[in-house]
Amino acid sequence: MKTTPFTDVHIALGAKMHEFAGFNMPIEYSGIIDEHMTVVNGVGVFDVSHMGEFWVKGPNALAFIQSVTSNDASVLPLGKAQYTCFPNDKGGIVDDLLVYHYEPEKYLLVVNAGNIDKDWEWCVSHNTVGAELENSSDRTAQLAIQGPKAQEVLQRLTPVDLSSIPYYSFVTGEFAGCKNVIISNTGYTGAGGFELYFYPSDGMTIWNAIFEAGKPEGIKPIGLGARDTLRLEMGFCLYGNDLDDTTSPIEAGLGWITKFAEGKNFTNRAELERQKKEGVTRKLCAFELQEKGIPRHGYEIADAEGNVIGVVTSGTMSPVLKKGIGMGYVKPEFAKAGTDIFIKVRNKNLKAQVVKAPFRK
């Protein structure tokens, strides 16, 4: 298994470790619910060094990004980030990712850990405009410091005014005495906070400084288990569950990152444009259970008569709502908020109601 600069410290702290996307990663420390609530109410630190980072450089950098991603990067100012996806040639999604506009002719793509090799091959094979591509995944470490107290803690460690960095914006500066740290106002938790990108050799300096600075706020390390429950409470999609090679961004409710701007001829644009105009045969919806139970990935979704109308893609017991929540694909007529649906849990059909995400307001 691959390791991150923080693997040894996770083990030393007693984390429950497990393989994830080929990496030995911490799933939980003190327990998923405790860690979840730490982030919602205070501040927690996630090791997300397993994520992938690709640099796109040169005069044709923007042209390349426009040809392989669904969102419109031509309107992305310097110092801003954008959520987008790589559409595939069958109407599905290669991966969802973030694009950072780093310099006038330099962009950073941040991709999912489980898709690094697939994404890299996709980018290289679709680089018809001669952009300069660099896979720096193994040379980049990343921590996500999330929660309402994150900014307060991190401000003690940098001369950069964190309050001046709007959501989905970033700066590169000094942090904990380390140079060239990307400080990004982004996250996958809905609780606020920052993501830091830095050299692996600076990893433990930054880790130790953050935990020392955050002692008064009761800062804790957080595992991937709580990362999943936090993102699900926000209705954020997870690749491999809610998105994959067969789900289109239109079906997944990601029409807002699928821009049909003039001259933006990304992969399979015509098919996605057709879907937007004519409609789709299934839609991703969010739902809350009205009865006791926990929906899980792969459970069937039924109508009142027991007819199967879809499938659960993500589900959990919400630590904040204290009820079962989930997302799944259903026939479009069942995707509207307020619609009653039923989740097949073992031998029972548990009543649920479609809601508008996020679950945690």
Swiss-Prot record:
It is an enzyme of class 2 (transferase). Its EC number is 2.1.2.10. It catalyses: N(6)-[(R)-S(8)-aminomethyldihydrolipoyl]-L-lysyl-[protein] + (6S)-5,6,7,8-tetrahydrofolate = N(6)-[(R)-dihydrolipoyl]-L-lysyl-[protein] + (6R)-5,10-methylene-5,6,7,8-tetrahydrofolate + NH4(+). InterPro entries: GCS_T, GCS_T_bac, GCST_C, GCV_T_N, GcvT/YgfZ/DmdA, GcvT/YgfZ_C, TrmE/GcvT_dom1. Keywords: Aminotransferase, Transferase. GO terms for biological process: glycine decarboxylation via glycine cleavage system. The keyword Nucleotide-binding does not apply. NCBIfam families: gcvT, PRK00389.1. The glycine cleavage system is composed of four proteins: P, T, L and H. This is Aminomethyltransferase. The gene is gcvT.
